Amino acid sequence: MGRITSFADLIGRIKDKASQSKAALVSSNTKSKTLSFHLSVLRATTHDPSTPPGNRHLAVILSAGTGSRATASSAVESIMERLHTTGDACVALKSLIIIHHIVKHGRFILQDQLSVFPASGGRNYLKLSAFRDEKSPLMWELSSWVRWYALYLEHLLSTSRIMGFFISSTSSTIHKEEYEEMVSSLTNSDLLREIDALVGLLEEACKIPDLPFSGGKSLADKITQLVGEDYVSSINELYTRFNEFKERSNTLSFGDTIELVCALKRLESCKERLSEICHGNWKRGWIDGFWGLVLEVKGIIGNLEDNYGQIEKSIVGFGKRDKGYESARFTDRLIIGYSNPVRFSSGRFSNVDRFNFPVSGRVLC
């Protein structure tokens, strides 16, 4: 616990104690696992800006994935209720961090319940685009993090739906050779659709706010770490797909070439910002190799660096994937519902170890 620096901090601590005490009292008088998960959510999402959710509480929440579907559903409902009923930026950020941990470390049954909540779906999935906490300068700064982080996680879930598995999930079993064979069986259209989604996710990652000046650095650092891990996972996926397009370079249609060029340009525009986010040496050689592959693919499909202008003139008539079109598709693909199942366990492999690069809990970048 950080020290109390304002009356608002004191009120937040009192609220934490009151809500946790009430939940603990009720939980002690019942055998319901639902109340146990609810208590862990409360303990993981305190009003304290100096600490992210504790590993012990995260482990209890993630354990909901080892039970029944009803158990997993109740755990997700507790998280979402906490997220949607709070007006505190710290509580909201910690709730979003829990969601991110479920995507990365949760078992499939828990991830599945997260992906279908709410059943109706919607573009503003986490409903935080208008979030404002005006209690203090710090809360005002952290509010921008809440709005961005919620949108980023919406993109992460959307991209996962397109890919057919959860990006950056550590529940991976398929080896590199088998995975590459699966990718080679995809059509150009499927590959381009997946590349478009992955690049869109990295573009959203680039919009991460600057570190708050007034405090909350530990929360921001934790989020940056998680996003950095997603960055590594995303370029793993892109690497395989760009290699596949190298093999198909002589058979690409003009339209496919245009879409690939657009994706490469969008990706390159992210490079500098992504390097700022991921500024350490972890996997630095691999990351540099990926950007080298991007340059190589550009050259293979026609000295594109020199011919971008000519190709771009054709885009207007061809129908570039612009933002309006992407937004129109977002709602349709965001939630992984039972009526529109994702290919988790069939030909698209639900558990894939891209290049056998396990993403650990340590700071990657």
Curated annotation (Swiss-Prot):
InterPro entries: ANTH_dom, ANTH_N_plant, AP180-like, ENTH, ENTH_VHS. GO terms for cellular component: clathrin-coated pit; clathrin-coated vesicle; Golgi apparatus. It is found in: Membrane, Clathrin-coated pit; Golgi apparatus; Cytoplasmic vesicle, Clathrin-coated vesicle. GO terms for biological process: clathrin coat assembly; clathrin-dependent endocytosis. Residues 29-167 form the ENTH domain. One of its GO terms (molecular function) is phospholipid binding. Transmembrane segments: none annotated. This is Putative clathrin assembly protein At4g40080. The lineage of its organism: Eukaryota, Viridiplantae, Streptophyta, Embryophyta, Tracheophyta.
